[in-house]
Amino acid sequence: MQRSPLEKASVISKLFFSWTIPILKKGYRQRLELSDIYQISSADSADNLSEKLEREWDRELASKKNPKLINALQRCFFWRFTFYGILLYLGEVTKAIQPLLLGRIIASYDPDNKMERSIAIYLGIGLCLLFIMRTLLLHPAIFGLHHIGMQMRIALFSLIYKKTLKLSSRVLDKISIGQLVSLLSNNLNKFDEGLALAHFVWIAPLQVMLLMGLLWELLQASAFCGLAFLIVLALLQAGLGRMMMKYRDQRAGKINERLVITSEMIENIQSVKAYCWEEAMEKMIENLRQTELRLTRKAAYVRYVNSSAFFFSGFFVVFLSVLPYALIKGIILRKIFTTISFCIVLRMAVTRQFPWAVQTWYDSLGAINKIQEFLQKQEHKTLEYNLTTTEVVMENVTAFWEEGVGELFENAKQNNNSGNISSGDNRLFFSNFAILSTPVLRGINFKVERGQLLAVAGSTGAGKTSLLMMIMGELEPSEGKIKHSGRISFCSQFSWIMPGTIKENIIFGVSYDEYRYRSVIKACQLEEDISKFAEKDNIVLGEGGITLSGGQRARISLARAVYKDADLYLLDSPFGYLDVLTEKEIFERCVCKLMANKTRILVTSKMEHLKKADKILILHEGSSYFYGTFSELLNLRPDFSSKLMGYDSFDQFSAERRNSILTETLRRFSFEGDAAGPWNEPKKQSFKQTGEFGEKRKSSVLNPINAIKRFSIVQKTPLQMNGIEEDSEESSERRLSLVPDSEQGETILPRSNLINTGPTFQGRRRQSVLNLMTHSSVNQGQIVHRSTAASTRKMSLAPQENFTEMDIYSRRLSQDNGLEISEEINEEDLKECLFDDLESIPAVTTWNTYLRYITVHKNLIFVLIWCLVIFLAEVAASLVAFWLIEKTRPQDKGNSTRSTNNTSPVIITSTSAFYMFYIYVGVADSLLALGFLRGLPLVHTLITVSKILHQKMLHSVLHAPMSTLNTLKAGAILNRFSKDIAILDDLLPLTIFDFIQLVLIVIGAVVVVSILKPYIFLAAVPVIIAFVILRAYFLQTSQQLKQLESEGRSPIFTHLVTSLKGLWTLRAFGRQPYFETLFHKALNLHTATWFLYLSTLRWFQMRIEMIFVVFFVAVTFISILTTGEGEGTVGIILTLAMNIMSTLQWAVNSSIDVDSLMRSVSRVFKFIDMPAEESKYTKSVKPYKDGQLSKVMILENQHVKKDDIWPSGGQITVKDLTAKYIDGGNAILENISFSISPGQRVGLLGRTGSGKSTLLSALLRLLNTEGEIQVDGVSWESVTVQQWRRAFGVIPQKVFIFSGTFRKNLDPYGQWNDQEIWKVADEVGLRSVIEQFPGNLDFVLVDGGFVLSHGHKQLMCLARSVLSKAKILLLDEPSAHLDPITYQIIRRALKQAFADCTVILCEHRIEAMLECQRFLVIEENKVRQYDSMQKLLSEKSLFQQAISPSDRLKLFPQRSSSKHRSRAQITALKEEAEEEVQDTRL
């Protein structure tokens, strides 16, 4: 970054913002880079500001029982805030004085006051000086207030982040990541620009008092008629605002539903394509879009009427103020024009500035209270341990994650007994809820000597991770004592990678030791991986290590823990993502050898690890099931083995018995969504997280329309969808609605829905920060949105008369009432959705984009012509007013000759009053009617254009090849459907209309003034040209600065999420200060771009004002010096001149807004223009013998349910297959060739990242491929993509459950009747799972099916494959994270339903591979071996290395003799089961 010219700028340069000219020049000539941005001053640095506020907040905490954050802010910023408020007030006072001078100028042309004609020139000079004074007062004041708001935001950002790192885990379990992002983005954005409006809470009343005093002098009591009308108008607009909110509320639920489905589609686009669900998803989303658009139109119409009412009210304000006075006493022209000018200022103060100011204070104080509450939450306390011992001792330790759970349980029990539960299985309710009534750990006793290895095992939710958290001090014991040496190193169950190099991630701030580092790298099997990178271990990893495989991330996390020299190492399931061979090598070389002299506590689920551990602790439901050695385990706990053995007899049970066992076993996991498998904390479940049963669950999702729009979400909950009534409460955070035409809803993006364990529980579920840290969150069906990109400038809803820049700014800000971010957000994708990648879209929207947009709908051009025709009609109506003046001039002369010395010349007399009244009202009504006719068709048509563009973009994304989609972030795609479509729906129609109307008003006014004084036209032309040139000059730089600001905003939030995910690791390593420094750097980077944007914007606005002042000086003196008799002409010219330039100033700003919004259209067009998948693959369809291909075409078009001729056997032949993820990328698979016979089962073997899953994707034509694949002799080039994929059944690695009913999830095309679906559900053991929910097949699943365990979801995928009647089945890690019983269910179903099918299986479990006849071994992207298991075991191979000799002797009987099959499976289960303890008692 460069040094800022502001440091050496003169006072004049600072006053006129001339120091920004260098960056404006550079931005106009070339594309700006981050290096071009100026450095911030020390006063704006996050370090200084946070230190200053933190000092005052600590002082507030120490001195008072009830500390107030606003007091700390006041001590930091009050005097500067007050100073700029006074400047702002003085600038506003000049607006009230201007009409006085205007009246005096008009009065100087009074025929009876010829003596005053000589002072007109001086009055003109005074009027011009007032404009200059206003410019010099307002702009520094606005900029200063923006600057203070920015500093407040930075200081609070830092304070919140520091507090986040200190929060206790119990508090973090109650806070969602969305709440934290809301504090940082939504609440704090209110300070950034809203601070400039805060002073109007006292300025506006003073302004009204001053204006009413001046109007009283002119019109006496009649002036209050106009004020009363303005108050009524404000109330009317508030009513219209509430009506609009009603439509917004209704519409928000539909937007939510659409975006939930859309996000699920995008996140699982590979599964959608694999299942051939493109048409079903498109139809589903478009149906929701239709309903949404009906409500969008209604809201847009009300909003249009609202803003139009404000604009056209100008006629009636003046009319009602003047009429009573005129009827009683008559009125002169001077008073009319002066009244018009006063009423314009008065109307702005009453209907805009004061409501906005109250709203700003209401929002700001609410935000401060939220932040204050957050800053007072309980902090993490490091427990005081006995530092003299080198052992770990726990004595009768009991702990709860949630305090007061017993009371919560009793309340739930009372609710249940009182009959609040409408229907359903009560046993289900209590079997789930009983988990919460017990402590997470209870009566734990163990002792580990120095250098020993303690293996901790147990079923899911047994409390294994909680045990480690207890040792780390994250969980405080309720009873008992803990002792250990205190120096801890920790490896999380889910790998955490910070942005930086591999080396930085491993060293993690510890002093570098070359020998130790190399030893750790070798022991953690990272040498080979690092050697593949060109930069070796200096390769920079993205946030979360997204460029690495899961296994690589896990090994880096383990290496970080091992590298630190500690007394105690806590390893929480570090081998979860490793293949069998790698896991075996790391356990032996790293855990057993390298760390042999260290005390280690290892959470594991492997029998081999238990054998080699010095001590074993088995937990079951929070209690110690066993503590001792492995030999003692076999002797003292024989039931531990018998339970495993019992699983082998599972197939012998009846179907009802199997379903009962399955339901009872999985029921324990169903509460935590995907918490089955290795996720360890289902005790910290939704009941506890909600805090209380009746709490209304908040919205999830970061608003995609960053700082543009707010929507209120009111959506049917799943209970309501399923026919169960729910008590709805008004949200406690409803906003005070004072600004009638602002969008005061909540957010537009989806809400996760109710927990649905049946009809028995009406509590709410949300993802807490603790769940983010433990990854026990639902990672499907959630949305971010997304985007905290740079604010698009705010839009006007209606043209304004005689607006100052402050009025314009205020109006713009009203459309940005703050980004109301809801309580939740999808943590998994937050990093992707905070900003869009820097896209190849020009800084200024091209004319081609405008042309394409106009031609999207054939009627749009005609509507634009219609607007022009209406405009001409309005001009004609305006001529009536001038005719009126002309008609009254003779009467004026007559009246003046008949008048006495005490009577002024009048326009309206008692004899002509009613005649003039009817003409005036007629003109006003005509303009009102014409205005409505002009705008509504345009708004209606532009919303239709948005509908068409959404349809085209949705179709394009669904049918785009994966190679194209792989180059895009999910968040970037989702932003197109959320942020950009919302802009097209809401902002763009009214903003385009606004711009067109403003331009036409300016043209019309210039024409009228030029007709009255042709010389003024000569002055207007160069001024308009200057405006256009200035706009083009500024726009190039401003758009680039906003783009850089957007990029600078992203690291702030990604750093927050990164820190939260690794918070336990940060604390264990003591790296909080380092991460605070990184956060401050991110803040400073964003501050530099935002401050420069504010400065250049102020430069632009000030230059507009300066041009306006020059023009007004010219108009004033031309009109004064060239006008003879006729006060009316001078009044019209000066009044219109003031109106022209303020309107033209706003028109220029509006054009910038339109250009900014049209960038959303450019991005939508970019997605519409993506290549289609079919065109990429389709070649001429070759005829096939016996008409087989034509029957395939029937399958494609009609989704026939009967068995089709192709494929009939399932034979697969692959020749020279090469696959790439993206065009031009590296080959993931090279020259793969093999063949599979019909009905054969083939297992894929290979290390993590070798390309097994990639091969399955290539078979489905999801990648860029070369070579040939044939199924039953039919080449993939001779059939369509859809036909090809329907030949395969798929169980993907990432399970896809979209928001919808069970029926829709199993059969989205509606091909099968209920009888057939229930039959398949019986086959796969899914019936009892579905029957426990109300509505059965019609029960609505939400949030990626969070009420289902991972096992349930795998069964859903299995049922889909059975329904597909496919002859080829592809399975990608189907047993991942499954408990033994569900695993046995899936094995049995696969044997029965797919007995005659060809199966390709990618699996890490050795037992699962035993069903395969042949194995395909993939190494280094190529096929190394393709043989039977016996052949592979007899040769040196990867498969042989993974199996020990003793295991081989046990496995062979399974293949050679059916009599010994049972015993072999028992042995395999003993060795490989991931859950050692399962309670299957019914």
Curated annotation (Swiss-Prot):
- Residue ranges of domain ABC transmembrane type-1 in the record: 81-365, 860-1156
Q: Give residue ranges on the Extracellular side.
A: 99-122, 217-222, 320-339, 881-919, 1013-1014, 1118-1131
Taken from the UniProt entry, a GO cellular component term is:
membrane
Q: Which reactions does this protein catalyse?
A: ATP + H2O + closed Cl(-) channel = ADP + phosphate + open Cl(-) channel; chloride(in) = chloride(out); hydrogencarbonate(in) = hydrogencarbonate(out); ATP + H2O = ADP + phosphate + H(+)
Region (Disordered) residue ranges read 1454-1482
Pfam families referenced in this protein's UniProt entry, alphabetically? ABC_membrane (PF00664), ABC_tran (PF00005), CFTR_R (PF14396)
Q: What is known of its domains?
A: Binds and hydrolyzes ATP via the two cytoplasmic ABC transporter nucleotide-binding domains. The two ATP-binding domains interact with each other, forming a head-to-tail dimer. Normal ATPase activity requires interaction between the two domains. The first ABC transporter nucleotide-binding domain has no ATPase activity by itself. The PDZ-binding motif mediates interactions with GOPC and with the SLC4A7, NHERF1/EBP50 complex.
Subunit annotation: Monomer; does not require oligomerization for channel activity. May form oligomers in the membrane. Interacts with SLC26A3, SLC26A6 and NHERF1. Interacts with SHANK2. Interacts with MYO6. Interacts (via C-terminus) with GOPC (via PDZ domain); this promotes CFTR internalization and thereby decreases channel activity. Interacts with SLC4A7 through NHERF1. Found in a complex with MYO5B and RAB11A. Interacts with ANO1. Interacts with SLC26A8. Interacts with AHCYL1; the interaction increases CFTR activity. Interacts with CSE1L.
Explain the purpose of this protein: Epithelial ion channel that plays an important role in the regulation of epithelial ion and water transport and fluid homeostasis. Mediates the transport of chloride ions across the cell membrane. Possesses an intrinsic ATPase activity and utilizes ATP to gate its channel; the passive flow of anions through the channel is gated by cycles of ATP binding and hydrolysis by the ATP-binding domains. The ion channel is also permeable to HCO(3)(-); selectivity depends on the extracellular chloride concentration.
Please report the name of this protein according to its UniProt entry.
Cystic fibrosis transmembrane conductance regulator
Q: Tell me the organism.
A: Rhinolophus ferrumequinum
